[in-house]
Amino acid sequence: MSSSRMPALFLGHGSPMNVLEDNVYTRAWRHLGETLPRPKAIVVVSAHWFTRGTGVTAMEAPKTIHDFGGFPQALYDTHYPAPGSPELAQQLVDLLAPVPVTLDKEAWGFDHGSWGVLIKMYPDADIPMVQLSIDSTKPAAWHLEMGRKLATLRDEGIMLVASGNVVHNLRTARWHGENTPYPWASAFNAYVKANLTWQGPVEKHPLVNYLEHEGGSLSNPTPEHFLPLLYVLGAWDGQEPVTIPIDGIEMGSLSMLSVQVG
């Protein structure tokens, strides 16, 4: 990564409780914020904004969305008042053309997939942000190609942060007691790590075809938490380092794996 080029990050966000807790994952997020070059703006792709078509937040002051239930009141009392950037939102509309991108001026904001990690990285909430939705109607290869389009922003001081979990099966999660990963979750997590720097035709990429892995569908019964990774892999230039700043599996079937490009 050149001194002026921003990294691209995929962060495994896990439980909303990470907002309130001090643990190995939140400390790693804080360390990233303290050691990476400070961006002039951030584009976030979160698993929690899964839409038909593509949208981007385009308001001056996006709201903090508490898109979860059954947690302590302190979590609902927490807000992340980072400024929006209508100018950056319009830049994304132009950059991603001919893909139609809707400017969202009131409906969405920053959901816990975005603010839940960035509140640890940049607790002062003073970096302009926009959030880009994930089009639920498109195949995996399309999302990797979107990452390629977004890569040019990295040379303009803009950081790409994608947030999800490469293993995300809440039906099998061990909510209490034993925290041992399921063998299939560990195997799929290892498969992801082994293929981060694969190069070849997009349609043949092992992580575009992640459901072909024997643990793919069990690790991801729905695609929205896996797809954000593909945006970051698409932003890789094929030569810069790809590292794993954070790894681990919580509750048996929730991967906290994070990936840094650049």
List each model region and its residues:
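A short aromatic-anchored loop/beta-hairpin motif
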Residues: 2-103
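Solvent-exposed alpha-helices and their adjacent loops that cap or buttress functional pockets
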Residues: 2-3, 35-36, 121-125, 152
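Beta-strand elements within well-structured catalytic alpha/beta cores of enzymes
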Residues: 7-11, 41-46, 132, 153-166, ...
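Short, basic/glycine-rich phosphate-binding loops at helix/coil junctions
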Residues: 9-10, 67-72, 122-130, 207-208
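Internal, conserved structured core segments that host functional sites
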Residues: 89-144, 149
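Surface-exposed, charge/polar-rich loops and edge strands
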Residues: 94, 98, 127-128, 136-138, ...
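Flexible, glycine/proline-enriched loop segments at strand-loop-helix junctions
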Residues: 75-83, 105, 133-140, 216
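Short glycine-enriched loops at secondary-structure junctions
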Residues: 47-51, 62, 109-118, 166
